[in-house]
Amino acid sequence: AYKLRPFTYIMNLKIRLTVMNFLEFAVWGAYLTSMGTFLFKAGYGSHIGFFYSIQGIVSLFMPGIMGIIADRWVQAQRLLSACHLFAAAFMIAAGLYGMTDGFSIGILFPLYSLSVAFYMPTLALSNSVAFNALNQAGMDTVKDFPPIRVFGTVGFIFTMWAVDFLGFQPTSQQFLLSGSLSVVLAVYSLTLPQVPVRSASSASGEKPTLVQALGLDAFRLFKRYDMAVFFIFSMLLGVSLQITNGFANPYITSFQSIPEY
């Protein structure tokens, strides 16, 4: 059983996890809804779909791989820091390269893809760090985590607006802002409560299979009608969301060139 912590410790912990969630999604909000405008203005409007689809592609395997590493070898808060550091390096490189005249999509896209590949696992890793810290403090994750997580949405909206107000939407400076925030979070993650590394064996003493380690056994839930319907409609919603993220901003900003508007 976990020991009950003093009120001041709990409040301090909540603030620390709130800052983590704010920064986690602020990194994403800096470019997710405005990157399409940058690509469109640069003459690469036909490639917008590739930039947004790569997020889903890397999400099929990178979170599972990083999850195995966090479970067996590297503490989650340290791996969270490392992932953000690599994501920042590639995102800043993409931002700087995008500022050059006549930049090639053949170079920008790999840099961006590598950054996204390291960023996507941090969504799950940050949750692991938060849940472990709350459990260690004897708190209820179902009750106490949602008010903390909502500040992730606040962070996303904050940087989304900041990019607009600073005039970064049609430029690659949005990548520089995202990368800079990743550096901040990489350093900050090292100050968060430690997450113990688990044994390589399961609770039953048996070594988990590769399918179990990657979480692929979760597909068994498709046998349940209600879960199958939920997953299918969630995927369809995700598709429409990415289309909106990629093309809504270029569509709206295109009216700037029409005198009537």
What do these predicted regions represent?
Residues 71-85:
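Cytoplasmic membrane-interface "Motif A"-like loop-to-helix N-cap segments
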Residues 6-11, 193-231:
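Juxtamembrane intracellular "pre-TM" segments in multi-pass secondary transporters
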Residues 22, 90, 103-124, 235-236:
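Hydrophobic core of transmembrane alpha-helices in multi-pass small-molecule transporters
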Residues 85-102:
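C-terminal ends and interior cores of transmembrane alpha-helices
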Residues 174-191:
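Symmetry-related core transmembrane helices of the 12-TM Major Facilitator Superfamily/SLC fold
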Residues 113-151:
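Cytoplasmic helix-loop-helix junction between adjacent transmembrane helices
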Residues 11-60, 226-261:
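Helix-loop boundary and gating motifs at the non-cytosolic
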Residues 61-75, 166-168:
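Helix-to-loop junctions at the C-terminal end of transmembrane segments
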